[in-house]
């Protein structure tokens, strides 16, 4: 005899309702959140512009079908593309994420909340261009900043206590959910329609972490966020037509997300949605490196300077010991061959060896031309990592959110340097005063990669004037980035 399952349509899951109520009703009052969102916007766009230097990224950009023309389509910064909002979202977020140089959120689940900008910016630009064509008011960049804060918050708050990586799911599912909610609200959907849209995001089959880990690490990790944001825009547009949703997408017995994909567990929440995530987000300012290694790379750069002063080189190194936190060991402690740039930028041994050898770590250092230097792999073999439980505890402490690494170098002559400890990277909220000037310099460098001096200055004049930027129509701001 089969078990009876009621066919009474349930109310929407509380987790979905909370997301929708937040995007529709929450008023952002935090000055710190808006200040940070402003810098986050600049940094994120700059990361996308740098990615245009890499053919592996550029080959994925443009319309799905060459020659497609979209009247009043969304612009893709640094290109001549004008696309439908779904494909524009893919283009923008793929650029943003390509070099692993945009922001980071570390918690039970990791991720990069500025990945959401692709969907937000593409939708806002498309809506603005169509509004102007119809004689109506466009959206402003202040609305983009508000959308960023809310997308950051949804992705980051769910990530605080819920480890999707533990069940093999990729964090871009949170990009899809967050972008769907924010974009749906931006599109003017009703509450019921946004509920439907968010439920559609949860019932999608979710991306696996296969492409982020040995032996399959590959470039999908660089366009997975673009895939997620484009899907979000697609689902929001479907919901706008009146497409139905699935109220117990998470909790349905046997067939819901919890039973199918989360081992029957339900989500835990540390705090209500507000503006906490944007206020505390981590910027990758100095090095394009997986964030659990940022402080290790900074320590390695300090050690390189000490070696220079002492007349030593990496050839004199006998052993390197890295005292670290558990998440670092689980994600980027990697031995054996590294097959491509995506493999290398997720290997702490590689990311420490390069600065110890050359006194630098740039995106180009992950390419084959640099990686074929046999000294790198030779030094990797001398690097040993172990967990310090205190570092792990500080990593999970919501009041600290430290990402500590400490490095000791021993030399073949029996000497050693004192351990270099870095607990907070320069992109951490505790080091904003140090970090923001460097972030702006990073933005300027990335503008110079794609634009002539006059165009760079036009972009900077608006971008660094917060009041002017916030009032500017989205379409006019993105027009500044046309090649």
Swiss-Prot record:
EC category: lyase
Catalytic activity: (2S,3S)-2-methylcitrate = 2-methyl-cis-aconitate + H2O; citrate = D-threo-isocitrate
A molecular-function term among this protein's GO annotations: aconitate hydratase activity
Annotated metabolic or biological route of this protein: Organic acid metabolism; propanoate degradation; Carbohydrate metabolism; tricarboxylic acid cycle; isocitrate from oxaloacetate: step 2/2
Presence of the UniProt keyword Lyase in the record: yes
One Pfam assignment: MmgE_PrpD_N
EC number assigned by the record: 4.2.1.79, 4.2.1.3
Keywords on record: Lyase, Tricarboxylic acid cycle
A GO BP entry: propionate catabolic process, 2-methylcitrate cycle
Superkingdom of this protein's organism: Bacteria
NCBIfam families linked: PRK09425.1, prpD
Binding partners and assembly: Monomer.
Function: Involved in the catabolism of short chain fatty acids (SCFA) via the tricarboxylic acid (TCA)(acetyl degradation route) and via the 2-methylcitrate cycle I (propionate degradation route). Catalyzes the dehydration of 2-methylcitrate (2-MC) to yield the cis isomer of 2-methyl-aconitate. Could also catalyze the dehydration of citrate and the hydration of cis-aconitate.
Family membership noted in the UniProt record: Belongs to the PrpD family.
PANTHER family: 2-METHYLCITRATE DEHYDRATASE, 2-METHYLCITRATE DEHYDRATASE-RELATED
Official protein name in the record: 2-methylcitrate dehydratase
Organism: Salmonella typhi
Species classification: Bacteria, Pseudomonadati, Pseudomonadota, Gammaproteobacteria, Enterobacterales
